[in-house]
């Protein structure tokens, strides 16, 4: 969902006339998601030439991956993201993707968020970033982070609104049968989901 949710928002935006191009990239030829879904042949990230105003979206995965030697030693990917950010490419993370951005250093002295179960750990591991708890998404200096899963959809709609206006984002949300648009300031935990014994 961290990948598919925002992807569907942008796809529907294209269907409504947004001038967007979606590219899927990875460090290899294919990926297996944390849920076990195999995603076939994809471009290597280095094949993509980015320009100012583009977006890179890093979906979440098992936190252990972002803490693994395999990820941490992939310096060419890290440098590609850093270079993109210097070119004024917007960098977005969904859920645990914030750990990837923190590791490569582009969240330093910036606000960010992640899934409520991991905000404390993110702040502990990276004390030079400002982790905002209990918000759906943040935006700071061209870097967007979100709490994950459903909030990735909220973030994608926010980006569409910035690019194409409120009414355009409303049309896309309606097409996606979104019950209610949520801003980044909404809480991660819904009061409607509180456990009750009646």
Regions found by a protein language model. Name each.
Residues 176:
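Short, glycine-/aromatic-enriched active-site segment of Class I SAM-dependent methyltransferases
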Residues 1-91, 99-103, 133, 157, ...:
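Extended, subdomain-level signal for the structured scaffold at the beginning of enzyme domains
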